[in-house]
UniProtKB/Swiss-Prot annotation:
Pfam families attached to this UniProt entry: APH
Gene Ontology process terms (BP): threonine biosynthetic process
HAMAP family named among the record's database cross-references: Homoser_kinase_2
EC top class named in words: transferase
GO molecular function: ATP binding; homoserine kinase activity
Pathway(s) the chain acts in: Amino-acid biosynthesis; L-threonine biosynthesis; L-threonine from L-aspartate: step 4/5
Record's catalysed reaction(s): L-homoserine + ATP = O-phospho-L-homoserine + ADP + H(+)
Record-stated family: Belongs to the pseudomonas-type ThrB family.
Protein name (Swiss-Prot/TrEMBL): Homoserine kinase
Annotated EC: 2.7.1.39
PANTHER family: AMINOGLYCOSIDE PHOSPHOTRANSFERASE DOMAIN-CONTAINING PROTEIN, AMINOGLYCOSIDE PHOSPHOTRANSFERASE DOMAIN-CONTAINING PROTEIN-RELATED
Natural source organism: Burkholderia pseudomallei (strain K96243)
Length: 331
C-alpha cells in the first residue's frame, strides 16, 4: 500500500462529489505495501480507505470489490466498498480504477500470540466457506504462470545458488500443480496475502471469555480463486514463523491450524500435500519480493520488503515440511 499516484486536494474534492460521505476532515497517504496507492480518508460520516489500483484493470476489479461485498454480507469482517452516486463500487481517478471502502476497527498485531492465531484460523475457514457460492471467478494472478514469467526476469540479479533454488523449486511446483492430487484439493476464493499487517484486532468485549477480538481482514487486492490450502499455507508462513530463522513456531502453527479445522476439517489430500503447499506459499513471496526489490516501480512512498526473509522460509520448509494436526476441538 504505497503511494504511486499523488492526489491533490482539488483532485479529492472532485472525486468526493460522487459520494454521499459528508465533508473531508483528513486525508493522508499510507506508506506500507508495494502494489497500489492507498490513503486514509476521514469525513464527517466516518473513516474510510481510498485505493487507486496501479495494476488491476477496470475489467478485473469487479471480482475484488464484489468479493468483499459478498463476504461482508455473509458475516465475514472485511472492508465494505462504498457505492458511488451511480450505484457502482469503483470509478476512475487519474485514469486508473479507484474505490473507497470502509475502514475496519482495531490495529495490526505484528507480534501475534497463540490467541491471535486462533482468531485468524477460525475466521479464515469461515471466509473460505462463505465464498463457496461467490459467482465470479478470477485465478490467483501470482500463481504458477506468473512464477514462470517472472523467474527469468529476476535470474540475472541473484547468485548461482539462488538461481538453482528458484529453478528447482519451480520445477517441483510445476509437477505438483500438474498432479491429480492437486486438482482434487478443495478450492474457492482466497485472500492469498493474509499477512499479519492485513488483519486488525480490537479490544475484546468484557465477559466474552476471549482475550482478543479480530476486527477483520483487509487488502483483498491479491485475492483469487485458488486451493484453500494455499491460503492457509501463506497465512501460517507469516503468522506462525520465527522471524530470524524462518522456522515455524509450533505453538502458533498448531493453534491456527486446529482453529481452522474446527470450522472446516482438512481432507486427506490436503494432509498429504501440506509440505508442498507450505513451499508454494514461501516460493510465491520470495519470487515477488525479488522482483519488487530488483525491478522496483517509482513511487512517492515505498518500502520494499527483504527478499531474503522468504528465501529462508522456503529453505526451512524444504528441510522441515511438518504435518497438519489431527482434528479435535480447539480450546
Amino acid at each position: 500500500m504505497a503511494v504511486f499516484t499523488a492526489v491533490s486536494d482539488a483532485d479529492l474534492a472532485l472525486w468526493m462529489r460522487h459520494y454521499d460521505l459528508g465533508d473531508v476532515v483528513a486525508f493522508r497517504g499510507i506508506p506500507s505495501g508495494i502494489e497500489n496507492s492507498n490513503f486514509f480518508l476521514t469525513t464527517t460520516r466516518g473513516e474510510y480507505v481510498l485505493t487507486i489500483f496501479e495494476n488491476l484493470t477496470a475489467g478485473q476489479l469487479p471480482f475484488y470489490v464484489d468479493l468483499m461485498s459478498h463476504l461482508a454480507k455473509h458475516g465475514v469482517p472485511v472492508p465494505a466498498p462504498v457505492a458511488r452516486d451511480d450505484g457502482t463500487l469503483f470509478g476512475e481517478l487519474h485514469g486508473k480504477p479507484a474505490a473507497i471502502v470502509t475502514k475496519l476497527e482495531g490495529a495490526a498485531q505484528l507480534a501475534p500470540g497463540v490467541e491471535h492465531c486462533v482468531e485468524v484460523g477460525q475466521m479464515l475457514a469461515r471466509m473460505h466457506l462463505a465464498g463457496r457460492d461467490y459467482p465470479r471467478h478470477q485465478p490467483n494472478l501470482r500463481s504458477l504462470p506468473w512464477w514462470r514469467d517472472t523467474v527469468p526476469a529476476i535470474a540475472p540479479f541473484v547468485t548461482g545458488e539462488q538461481r538453482a533454488l528458484l529453478e528447482g523449486e519451480l520445477a517441483h511446483q510445476a509437477a505438483f500443480f500438474a498432479s491429480d492430487d492437486y486438482a482434487a484439493l478443495p478450492e474457492g476464493p482466497c485472500h492469498c496475502d493474509l499477512f499479519r499487517d492485513n488483519a486488525l484486532f480490537a479490544h475484546a468485549e468484557p465477559d466474552t471469555g476471549h482475550s482478543v477480538r479480530l476486527g477483520g481482514f483487509f487488502d483483498f487486492y491479491f485475492a483469487g480463486c485458488d486451493k484453500w490450502l494455499f491460503d492457509v499455507a501463506v497465512t501460517v508462513n507469516d503468522w506462525c514463523v520465527d522471524l530470524p530463522t524462518g522456522a515455524l513456531d509450533a505453538a502458533r502453527a498448531d493453534a491456527l491450524l486446529r482453529a481452522y479445522q474446527t470450522v472446516r476439517p482438512f481432507t486427506a489430500g490436503e494432509r498429504r500435500h501440506w509440505g508442498d503447499m507450505l513451499r508454494a506459499g514461501a516460493y510465491r513471496f520470495w519470487v515477488s519480493r525479488l522482483y519488487d526489490f530488483h525491478l522496483p516501480r517509482a513511487a512517492q512512498m515505498l518500502k520494499p520488503h527483504d527478499p531474503g526473509h522468504f528465501e529462508r522460509i522456503l529453505r526451512e520448509r524444504i528441510a522441515h515440511a511438518g504435518a497438519l494436526p489431527e482434528t479435535h476441538a480447539c480450546n
